[in-house]
């Protein structure tokens, strides 16, 4: 069913784009956390100056009509030493509190993830920063922090690393408490293909951890045929994540995809 556009960049805090984020569902209310992009007029590089990357929140009861829309954090609310590139809030609940991870780029081009905590989903405090001892890319986009059988994982899409595909994405296994102090394992790629980026996961009602990726290739030299209809790009097929007990993720197609299968065909000799 084709539904109307729900989120428009129609406020001063998101006037140049509703950028990616995440959703939280509680008590029949949908909380949509996203990045509000603002490009201030002037002679700026829009990396270290001139850009607002705001954490915004929209709420809805039916996922069609908005009840409220507000800005929760502006550039000045982030830790010192960062560029204007802070984005992609992923929010989840744990032990009666709420947590948010944000991708960030430092002034010396070091990718990292900011961890925030909240008691009410509205007011957020920075409690930790997760990164590598040496720079691993200049920006970590679309972070996702999740736990599988007692092991925590941090998935990121780092910009500025050498990889065989166009857009690299992968994950670290975490040792320690990510709320206070932790170290990261070796980085593992999530996909060896060329069109899988910015993956995000959620916990299904039956406990499975399901992940979708972005099938986009925005800088490719081909044009998607759907552009003339006002949209482009897709989400990938859902994958169920498990772990092998040694800090590595395993991926399998979601069982629901079986219902889409048709009659099997054998290749001709």
Spell out what each predicted region is.
Residues 193-197, 202-203:
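Catalytic and ligand-binding motifs that coordinate phosphates/metal ions
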Residues 138-143, 197-199:
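Repeated scaffold domains used in trafficking and secretory/extracellular systems
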Residues 1-88, 93-137, 147-192, 215-268:
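Beta-rich carbohydrate-recognition and catalytic domains
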């Amino acid at each position: 069913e084709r539904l109307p556009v729900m989120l428009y960049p129609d406020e001063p805090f998101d006037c140049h784009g509703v950028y990616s984020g995440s959703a939280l569902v509680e008590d029949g209310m949908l909380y949509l956390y996203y990045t509000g992009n603002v490009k201030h007029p002037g002679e700026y590089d829009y990396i270290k100056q001139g850009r607002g990357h705001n954490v915004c929140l929209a709420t809805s009861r039916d996922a069609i009509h908005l009840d409220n829309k507000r800005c929760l954090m502006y550039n000045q609310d982030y830790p010192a030493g960062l560029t204007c590139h802070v984005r992609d809030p992923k929010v989840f609940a744990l032990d009666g509190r709420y947590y948010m991870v944000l991708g960030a780029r430092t002034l010396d081009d070091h990718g990292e993830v900011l961890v925030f905590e909240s008691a009410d989903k509205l007011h957020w405090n920075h409690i930790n920063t997760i990164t590598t001892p040496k720079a691993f890319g200049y920006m970590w986009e679309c972070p996702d922090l999740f736990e599988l059988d007692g092991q925590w994982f941090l998935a990121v899409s780092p910009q500025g690393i050498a990889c065989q595909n166009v857009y690299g994405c992968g994950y670290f296994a975490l040792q320690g408490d990510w709320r206070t102090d932790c170290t990261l394992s070796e980085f593992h790629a999530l996909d060896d293909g060329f069109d899988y980026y910015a993956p995000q996961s959620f916990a299904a009602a039956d406990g499975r951890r399901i992940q979708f990726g972005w099938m986009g290739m925005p800088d490719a030299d081909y044009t998607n045929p759907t552009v003339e209809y006002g949209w482009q790009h897709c989400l990938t097929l859902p994958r169920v994540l498990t772990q092998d007990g040694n800090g590595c993720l395993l991926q399998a197609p979601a069982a629901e995809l079986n219902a889409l299968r048709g009659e099997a065909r054998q290749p001709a000799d």
